[in-house]
Amino acid sequence: MNDHKPPIEEFMGLSFNMSTVLMTTIACLIVFLITFIGTRRLSMNPSGLQNFLEWVVDFIRGIIKANMDWKVGGRFIVLAYALLFYVFVANMLGLPFELYNPTTHEVWWKSPTSDPVLTLTMAAFVVILTHYYGIKIQGFGKYLKGYITPVPFLLPFKIIEEFANTLTLGMRLFGNVYAKEILMILLVTAGTSGLIGMFGAFLPLIVWQAFGLFIGAIQAYIFAMLAMVYMAHKVESH
């Protein structure tokens, strides 16, 4: 298990984890296809996939309304939908199994969110968007004034908070998904070590997969919810 490593490719002096690139692409395609198929033939009496997607949208609408006024927050429903759905699918991809090259020991099929580079990039993207919409909605002057309100002494702490938000948002997702996959690999390794190991690891593996489903769903919710919390802090006056 310890010999497993990511497939790294160099391009223009930069290193790319090709497993993360592959699995991110697959997760995006799954989200796109489900959304496209579910909304291709909209009906006033929804059923099946359309009914499920409408439930997801209503759930996301509730997250936004809990954090900001809908007149302001309504524009972020597509962003929240994409974050929630993508993170959930990405978390689930490594749940049933992992695939690796037995010759090179490179892991190809896994949850892309078990890569800290991806989760921190997503977190940075969210934080940058909050600044963009904060300036767009409030105006540059009023937005900057928020950093010295109610007292200018808070300025350095609010700057530190921006970096802390990025770090915690990304590392929380990475840490939970990575721990889930590490324990799953341990159980699979034990299950393939022999007949006794197979029977001993079977039930814990099933239980942990069920718990992994719960972890993946909760982390997707937390990521989307915190994204809307950070957005509300920037676009609404306090």
From Swiss-Prot:
Entry's family note: Belongs to the ATPase A chain family.
Record protein name field: ATP synthase subunit a
Membrane-topology descriptor: Multi-pass membrane protein
Localization per Swiss-Prot or TrEMBL: Cell membrane
Domain of life: Bacteria
Subunit structure: F-type ATPases have 2 components, CF(1) - the catalytic core - and CF(0) - the membrane proton channel. CF(1) has five subunits: alpha(3), beta(3), gamma(1), delta(1), epsilon(1). CF(0) has three main subunits: a(1), b(2) and c(9-12). The alpha and beta chains form an alternating ring which encloses part of the gamma chain. CF(1) is attached to CF(0) by a central stalk formed by the gamma and epsilon chains, while a peripheral stalk is formed by the delta and b chains.
Keywords from the UniProt entry: ATP synthesis, Cell membrane, CF(0), Hydrogen ion transport, Ion transport, Membrane, Transmembrane, Transmembrane helix, Transport
Single GO term (MF): proton-transporting ATP synthase activity, rotational mechanism
GO CC term (a single one): proton-transporting ATP synthase complex
NCBIfam families noted in UniProt: ATP_synt_6_or_A (TIGR01131), PRK05815.1-4 (NF004479)
GO terms of biological process kind: proton motive force-driven plasma membrane ATP synthesis
Membrane-spanning parts: 18-38, 76-96, 117-137, 195-215, 216-236
Signal sequence region: none
Function comment: Key component of the proton channel; it plays a direct role in the translocation of protons across the membrane.
